[in-house]
Each structure stands twice: as C-alpha cells, then as structure tokens.
Amino acid sequence: MVHVTLLYGGRSAEHDVSVRSARFVARTLCLQHTVMLIGITRRGVWYAQPACALEQLCTGTVALSIQEDEKRRVCLVPGGGTAGAFVIAGMPCVTDVVFPVLHGSYGEDGTVQGLLEMLQVPYVGCGVCASALAMDKVKAKMLWQAAGLPVLPFVFFRKDAWRMHMQEFVAQLETRLGYPLFVKPAQAGSSVGASAVQTRAPLIPAIEAAFQWDEVVLVERYVRAREIECALSGNGPYTVHGAGEVIAQGAFYDYEEKYADASVARVLVTAPLETAQYEQITTLALRAYEALGLTGLARVDFFLLETGEVYVNEVNTMPGFTSISLFPQICQAAGVAPQDLMAQLLSCARERFAARAALSTDLHAHVCAPSVTAAHDPDAQGDDWDQRDSNPLPTA
C-alpha cells in the first residue's frame, strides 16, 4: 500500500476540470492505497481535506470540493522528503508519491513539478523541463519541427510586439498562412482562449482575447480534420495504448464541448483507422513524446486530413480523467484497467525519482579521472572549449 498525496483544483482556468478528474483518480486509488487529498483554491492556497471527505467521495455520497479550513492549511518543507515535506496542523505527513491531478497553468507547466523537486518527493507525470516545453505550444512545435515531425504552419508573437506592429503581423498572417486561421494562447489548455476566424474582421478581437490568457499568442492555419488522440505512458520504453477520436459538432472541440454536461461531441475510444494510418499516427506519437522528453503519461493529439496528411497538434502531460475523457478509456480498451493504470503511474513516478536521486549533485564528493578533468578544463581547451550551444538538435 502506497501513501499517495493527490493535488487537485489549482490556480488555473481548468480548476473545475481538475476537480472532476481528481474524483476519478481518488476513487480508483483509494481501493488499494492510502490517499490524502490536498485541494488548491483558485487563489493558489493549499488545504488538506479531512478523511471523511475521501470516505464520502469513495462511497459516492458527495461530490469532490475544497474545504478551506485554516487549521488544515498545508505547510511545505523544502528537502523534507517523503517523511516531512507536507506539514498539516504542525504534524508531518508521510507521502510516498504525489499525484498532481492539475490541468493548465500552475499545474502542468513545470511550476508544481519544480516545487515537488525541491520538496524531494516522487510525483506522477513529467519533469520540470518536459512539462514546461509541453505546455508551451510554440516551443513544442519548434522541437517537433527540429525532430522532423509534421506540424501545421504557424506564426507567434508576444503581446508587446503585437501592440507595436499589429498591422504588420496581420499582413504576415494573411500572406504566410491565409484564412481561415486558428488563434490560441501559447500556454493554455482545454481550448481556453482559442477561436477560429474566417476573415480579417474577427482576427484582431480573437488575438486580443487570447492575450488575456498568455503573453504569447500562436496563430496557425485552420484545417477541417479528424481529431485523433493517442494515450501513452512509461519512462522508457514507452507504450502507446491506442488511438481514439473526438468528433466535435462545432468549428472545433472547444471547452464547452469537452466538459459541459450537455456536450454533443462524440468520442470514439477506438478511432476507425486503416492499419497504415494507425501505425503512422502511433509512431509519430512516440516520436513526439520522446522529442519533448516526456515521462509517466501523456496524450498526444493529431489532425488527420481528408488527403491523408497527419499533423501533430499538441500534447497534454496530465490528460483529463473525467467521465468523458479519452485517456483512461483508451487504456482500458487496451486491457489496462483503471487500478492497473494507477499502479503503473505510481511505479513510473518512483522509478524516475530513484533515477534522479542517484545522479551526482556535489562536485566535491567525486574525484574525476585525469582524462575526464582535462577534457572539461577551460584552460586546456581554450576560450571556446564549451561547444554545447553550437551542437545541432538531435532528430528522431
């Protein structure tokens, strides 16, 4: 039995989605493990939830919420490790693994991951760098391009540059991409702040709306395409559990269609694909996962055009676990039951933590061999001894 600390809520536009995902994860984990719930408010304050909240959740008598009891406000101890990183009411709480069921900003973007690294506790999901890269759609697309993966043509700009050169950017978008266009914040999930535009008139308002959610906006060519989602897990070797499909009723799969109770979007746990298409998409999913250095789990999304062209769209490092989320359904269809999936994710977290803990961090604790020392001696190599920045990016 593992002591799991489950984080949910968060200071994010996807707060409510996180709560719904956490409900599924908590109910699954509590069947085999000890679970401590920590709810994070929209203001970013952490509160440990009473044991009765978990009991009621697991028996299905109440929905998950966040009780803000100041006596149960969480204190964090950097370096506290599994025995003392989390302190509640003056008492340290044992935590074998943290499961951050957090979506979007301050959850999937490397911020919480960095905090958990400083606490020195294992956690489910990707590390700091991989989380940050995956959350930043611009950086992810650049890395995928460098790795030779297909992505839709795109343009991006910062808010300050947009303010100074608005008309130039509009002209650039019309020349390089052409209408219709798809506008979205570089760092936001669940289609928050995203919109499709057909002409110039709504373009500027769409960009301004996207800037409400991030300092960088990404604009790409809008395509009518099938939306294919692949579920992956592992630290290496990686597993592609399958490919599902989302059939949106609107211009695109927006927040309401993803999470509204009255959503009319259809999801197919097994996408109807030809064998060659399935192999192509799952191979690209593995390469996209590897290119960003992902670990634990992720959902990689694709566009499949009528012409047969396939484009990597984006990646989600903490996929939804709501009642309509494809990730757990794809895994279950592949023969991985929810309890087994949770066991795999906890195992990956502890495995990755052990591997990182084995790395050296103290230069003085090691005696380097003379040949190694000379190879890294600036005086021995001259002023330009460090050539790492000039090395080309590896291609998959």
Swiss-Prot record:
Residue positions binding Mg(2+) 1: D301, E314
Localisation: Cytoplasm
Catalytic activities: 2 D-alanine + ATP = D-alanyl-D-alanine + ADP + phosphate + H(+)
UniProt-listed PROSITE patterns: ATP_GRASP, DALA_DALA_LIGASE_1, DALA_DALA_LIGASE_2
EC number, as in UniProt: 6.3.2.4
Record-annotated ATP-grasp domain positions: 141-347
Cofactor: Mg(2+); Mn(2+)
Family that this chain belongs to: Belongs to the D-alanine--D-alanine ligase family.
Name of this chain's protein: D-alanine--D-alanine ligase
Gene that this polypeptide is encoded by: ddl
